């Protein structure tokens, strides 16, 4: 019998009404495995709890309890919210939060949501087995962004006795070699789902979210963006890596390894279809076309001329970035100049300015704030003609282009933030909607 993994995100569980929709789907389809995120907004509240003063933590705890109690009240089922949230009480006495404490605290969101969904399904006559994520997702010792130990997970999986037809599992969390709780990183519930799929040799992963699949561009930016019926793993990887928020980038690797297709659809309107993501033979030559666009605003661009450092300059700069804990969104090196993009939401401007001070000790460094990273995803985009065509189009916007970076499936460039949406709209109208060849 084929196995299917369903994953429901936080927006799918945000209200009692939404949870009822989720449980309708589960009880009707009876998927082999169900992975759930925390209820929308709960993880953010738990992060706030960790960063707050002792006095403020009491207020955050009340908000966390209140959010869950309102949902339980509207579901009209018995559910012990206070029993779950009592796990936070010891942290009202101790200000310092270690990385292990952080992982334990944030895991509460998924622990509650999995238990709640299971309880609702039970009232409808479908008893889900509980598969504890900490006993399945086995990782290294990083508490906040752990890496799965796949060999260990596979060995352990074969020892499990899975006798029930359907199981629910918490997303986002796992455990290390000492059995301590760890996190897979924000967005990690998608990763949990595909890891379970790989272990179970599933035939499909179905991601339920608040949109009907993957779009040619964020509909909040381009109102007439179109749903994409299908994408290759590589195309989706590029989209996810360069700003598309629908899927968490690492979650693709288990499905790529095992050849398991992913279907992205809406919890609220599943009959309208979605987007398939699967392996596609890219050895065939395709004409240069843009399939989708992504936009990352609130970025900064740094260029470093390391000519004076000689042949070891790039390695030295990379070492400085690593020592400052900076993982650029995009990096390109050419002619003794390296340029990289930093996300202002992740790396504060204060941290960026400090980095520039360090880099300037041995190189000529320039930092540009208020820029945007635009990426085009498609086929055969690495030809000089494509870059020439796009460069010519950008000249019409009379603003600087800070850098280009290209591969056969992705072409990225950095522009001033105020120009970005106009550029995106023109590229979408001229190439994506028309399915036009970029360069002839």
From Swiss-Prot:
Any GO CC annotation of this UniProt entry: cytosol
UniProt KW keywords: Amino-acid biosynthesis, ATP-binding, Diaminopimelate biosynthesis, Kinase, Lysine biosynthesis, Nucleotide-binding, Transferase
Superkingdom of origin organism: Bacteria
EC assignment: 2.7.2.4
Enzyme class: transferase
Protein's UniProt keywords contain Flavoprotein: no
Pathway listed: Amino-acid biosynthesis; L-lysine biosynthesis via DAP pathway; (S)-tetrahydrodipicolinate from L-aspartate: step 1/4; Amino-acid biosynthesis; L-methionine biosynthesis via de novo pathway; L-homoserine from L-aspartate: step 1/3; Amino-acid biosynthesis; L-threonine biosynthesis; L-threonine from L-aspartate: step 1/5
PROSITE patterns, A to Z: ASPARTOKINASE
MF-aspect GO terms: aspartate kinase activity; ATP binding
Entry's Gene Ontology BP terms: diaminopimelate biosynthetic process; homoserine biosynthetic process; lysine biosynthetic process via diaminopimelate; threonine biosynthetic process
Signal peptide: none
Catalytic activity: L-aspartate + ATP = 4-phospho-L-aspartate + ADP
Keyword hit for Transit peptide: no
NCBIfam families to which the protein is assigned, alphabetical: asp_kinases, PRK05925.1
Family per similarity comment: Belongs to the aspartokinase family.
Protein name per the record: Aspartokinase
Source species of the chain: Chlamydia pneumoniae
Lineage: Bacteria, Pseudomonadati, Chlamydiota, Chlamydiia, Chlamydiales
């Amino acid at each position: 019998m084929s196995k299917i993994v369903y994953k429901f995100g936080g927006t799918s569980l945000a209200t009692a009404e939404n949870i009822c929709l989720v449980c309708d789907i589960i009880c009707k389809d009876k998927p082999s495995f169900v992975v759930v995120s925390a209820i929308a907004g709960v993880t953010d509240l738990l992060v706030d709890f960790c960063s707050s003063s002792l006095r403020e933590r009491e207020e955050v705890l009340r908000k966390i309890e209140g959010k869950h109690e309102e949902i339980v009240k509207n579901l009209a089922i018995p559910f012990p919210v206070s029993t779950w949230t009592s796990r936070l009480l010891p942290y009202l006495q101790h200000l310092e939060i270690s990385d292990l404490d952080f992982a334990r605290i944030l895991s509460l969101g998924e622990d509650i949501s999995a238990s709640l969904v299971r309880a609702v399904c039970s009232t409808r006559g479908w008893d889900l087995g509980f598969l504890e994520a900490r006993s399945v997702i086995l990782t290294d010792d990083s508490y906040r962004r752990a890496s799965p130990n796949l060999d260990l997970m596979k060995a352990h999986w074969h020892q499990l006795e899975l006798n029930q037809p359907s199981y629910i599992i918490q997303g986002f969390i796992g455990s290390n070699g000492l059995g301590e709780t760890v996190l897979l990183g924000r967005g990690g519930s998608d990763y949990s789902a595909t890891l379970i799929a790989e272990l179970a040799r599933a035939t499909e992963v179905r991601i339920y979210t608040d949109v009907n699949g993957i779009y040619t561009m964020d509909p909040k930016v381009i109102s007439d963006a179109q749903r994409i019926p299908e994408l290759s793993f590589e195309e989706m990887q590029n989209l996810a890596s360069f700003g598309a928020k629908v899927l968490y980038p690492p979650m693709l690797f288990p499905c790529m390894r095992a050849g398991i297709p992913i279907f992205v659809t809406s919890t609220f309107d599943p009959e309208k279809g979605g987007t398939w993501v699967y392996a596609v033979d890219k050895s065939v030559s395709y004409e240069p076309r843009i399939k989708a666009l992504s936009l990352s605003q609130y970025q900064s661009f740094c260029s470093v001329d390391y000519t004076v450092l000689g042949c070891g300059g790039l390695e030295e700069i990379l070492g400085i970035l690593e020592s400052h804990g900076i993982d650029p969104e995009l990096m390109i090196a050419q002619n003794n100049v390296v340029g990289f993009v930093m996300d202002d939401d992740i790396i504060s401007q204060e941290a960026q300015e400090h980095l520039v001070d360090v880099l300037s000790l041995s190189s000529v460094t320039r930092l540009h704030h208020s820029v945007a990273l635009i990426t085009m995803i498609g086929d055969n985009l690495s030809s000089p003609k494509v870059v020439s065509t796009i460069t010519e189009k950008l000249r019409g916007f009379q603003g600087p282009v800070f850098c280009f970076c290209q591969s056969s499936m992705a072409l990225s460039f950095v522009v001033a933030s105020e120009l970005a949406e106009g550029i995106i709209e023109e590229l979408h109208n001229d190439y994506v909607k028309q399915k036009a060849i970029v360069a002839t």
